[in-house]
Amino acid sequence: MSDARNNRKVYRGRVVSDKMDKTITVVVETTKTDARYGKRVKYSKKYKAHDENGEAHTGDIVEIMETRPLSATKRFRLVDIVEKAVII
């Protein structure tokens, strides 16, 4: 049982929205190698993550971890705020 818990996906991304109550939207940018030409192509994906205390704000770099379904679209939870956004 503990092995299944340790195999959860952990992603690092940037918060693009914190307007919802206890929910943040995180963009995870990664690269994929093109099958035909071998060129590395950037792509991004948005995930909704549970933020219990409302700690993360737009622009922060965060780590999110896979968890049980918390709502119709939420499958991740906030683990750590790696870097706070600089507000000018």
Swiss-Prot record:
Listed PROSITE patterns: RIBOSOMAL_S17
Pfam family, one: Ribosomal_S17
Gene Ontology biological process terms from the UniProt entry: translation
GO molecular function ontology, one term from the record: rRNA binding
SUPFAM superfamilies listed in its UniProt record: Nucleic acid-binding proteins
Alphabetical UniProt keywords: Ribonucleoprotein, Ribosomal protein, RNA-binding, rRNA-binding
UniProt keyword annotation of Ribonucleoprotein present: yes
Lineage top rank: taxon: Bacteria
Cellular component terms (Gene Ontology): cytosolic small ribosomal subunit
Family: Belongs to the universal ribosomal protein uS17 family.
Complex and partners: Part of the 30S ribosomal subunit.
HAMAP family: Ribosomal_uS17_B (MF_01345_B)
Known role: One of the primary rRNA binding proteins, it binds specifically to the 5'-end of 16S ribosomal RNA.
Record's protein name: Small ribosomal subunit protein uS17
Organism per entry: Levilactobacillus brevis (strain ATCC 367 / BCRC 12310 / CIP 105137 / JCM 1170 / LMG 11437 / NCIMB 947 / NCTC 947)
Gene assigned in the entry: rpsQ
